[in-house]
Curated annotation (Swiss-Prot):
It comes from the Bacteria. A motif ('KMSKS' region) lies at residues 295-299. Catalyzes the ATP-dependent condensation of GlcN-Ins and L-cysteine to form L-Cys-GlcN-Ins. It is an enzyme of class 6 (ligase). Belongs to the class-I aminoacyl-tRNA synthetase family. MshC subfamily. This is L-cysteine:1D-myo-inositol 2-amino-2-deoxy-alpha-D-glucopyranoside ligase. Its EC number is 6.3.1.13. The keyword Metal-binding applies. SUPFAM superfamilies: Nucleotidylyl transferase. It comes from Catenulispora acidiphila (strain DSM 44928 / JCM 14897 / NBRC 102108 / NRRL B-24433 / ID139908).
Length: 427
């Protein structure tokens, strides 16, 4: 599966510093990446289930990890980035059945729209953009290994992962037992299924169901007990990450609603199947974007779609600025006022850099780098650019000798390159 075109990232003078990010597992700020200076930083971000268009919650998540990549690149780290597409799953099959569409055609069309939205928003693409369907052989291999290790078992033809196989289970999200049970049930788990050893045990391989797609696991897997079927959700990401990045990745990312059970389960499965730990050095989660008092989600239908705004003529850079105005870890409500403010900010910035010269900008790069390095403080970085723009506006029309002596022709270009390289905003 192919990703989307990569926007050019300008090189800036010098290098940024390590980025301190809030690690869900460590429950505090940690320096990232864990990779040594100059070495590649490895990041895995969970992708979409393609049964509907990209909404602001999606955009907020992928913008978060775009900023992290830009900061790592600025600090001198090449980035190895993998993202999946859950192109076979219950919500996709249910939407296809409800609309009378072929599930594969639905997944393909929504994935194509997602690529268009990411391109418009200038989100850096993954080097490996991998579908669940194409990864089924990888999943089968892991499920067989987990069975052989006694970490998985059969329930009426389905195969489940035993969470007790990983003594560190729970170390990612830090939920207590009642919270785990409730959250597991709310987010796709089946805690009440009879025959399971523990209510939290999660599905690795679902045996064939009538009217649903299934795959033949192969002779070796058949001998291990697998029947024709399809993969569970968590093991897909574990398999893809291990194949393309290996263990000990620098960062596992996604929305905060993925910390448990998805990232918890995936980490445990990877650690048990390899016998190594940690799966990831840090777990970084973006906040939820709401609308009308509820989390924006496909299932609820309370969506503000990137594509709809684009087709209405909204500049994608204004959408990007509207998202950057909120700290990545906060939960917040999308409002029309966010977009109005972002459109005005974009116009001011573009007007300021369109002038033939400008007020000094030598301190702006260090200030923006400092804000981004401090737990990805994008609102603070925007404020730095705003301050330069305000100085530029105040100097407009000041033709005194002192003012003219301070202006230089390089400043507008400096600001444009900074906003492009570190914030991804093309002026």
């Amino acid at each position: 599966m192919h990703a989307w075109p990569a926007p050019e990232v300008p090189e800036l003078p010098g290098h940024g510093s390590a980025v301190r990010l809030h690690d869900t597992a460590a429950q505090g700020l940690v320096p990232t990446p864990a990779a040594a200076p100059g070495e590649a930083a490895r990041i895995y971000v969970c992708g979409i289930t393609p049964y509907d268009a990209t909404h602001m919650g999606h955009a907020n998540t992928y913008l978060t990890f775009d900023l992290i990549q830009r900061a790592w690149l600025d600090a001198g780290h090449p980035v190895s980035y993998v993202q999946n597409v859950t192109d076979v799953d219950d919500p996709l099959l249910e939407r296809a059945a409800a609309t009378g569409r072929d599930w594969e055609a639905l997944a393909e069309s929504e994935t194509a729209l997602f690529r268009e939205d990411m391109t418009a928003l200038r989100i850096l693409p993954p080097q490996h953009y991998v579908g669940a369907v194409e990864s089924i052989p990888l999943v089968v291999d892991l499920v067989v290994k987990l069975l052989e290790r006694g970490a998985a078992y059969d329930v009426d033809g389905d195969v489940y992962f035993s969470v007790h196989a990983d003594p560190a289970f729970g170390a990612v999200a830090h939920l207590d037992a009642p919270e785990m049970l409730t959250t597991f049930g709310e987010r796709g788990g089946d805690p009440g299924r009879p025959g399971k050893k523990d209510p939290l045990d999660c599905l690795l391989w679902q045996a064939e169901r009538e009217g649903e797609p299934s795959w033949e696991p192969g002779e070796q897997a058949r001998a291990a007990g697998l029947k024709p079927g399809r993969p569970g959700w968590h093991i897909e990401c574990a398999a893809i990450a291990l194949e393309h990045l290996g263990m000990g990745i620098d960062l596992q990312g996604g929305g905060s609603d993925l910390a448990f059970p998805h990232h918890e389960m995936g980490a445990s499965e990877a650690q048990v199947v390899t016998g190594q730990r940690p799966y990831a050095h840090s777990y970084v989660h973006s906040g939820m974007v709401g609308l009308d008092g509820e989390k924006m989600s496909k299932s609820k239908g309370n969506l503000v779609l990137v594509s709809k705004l684009r087709h209405a003529g909204v500049d994608p850079m204004a959408i990007r600025l509207a998202l950057l105005a909120h700290h990545y870890r906060t939960d917040w409500e999308w409002t029309d006022a966010d977009l109005v403010s972002a459109v005005a900010r974009l116009a001011r910035w573009r007007a300021a850099v369109s002038r033939p010269d400008g007020v000094p900008a030598d301190d702006v790069l260090d200030a923006v780098r400092a804000r981004i390095a401090d737990d990805l403080d994008a609102p603070g970085a925007l404020a730095v650019i705003d301050a330069w723009v305000a100085r530029q506006e105040a100097a407009d029309g000041d033709d005194t000798a002192a003012a003219s002596a301070q202006r230089n022709t390089a400043a507008p270009g400096q600001i444009s390159r900074i906003t492009d390289a570190l914030l991804g905003v093309a002026l």
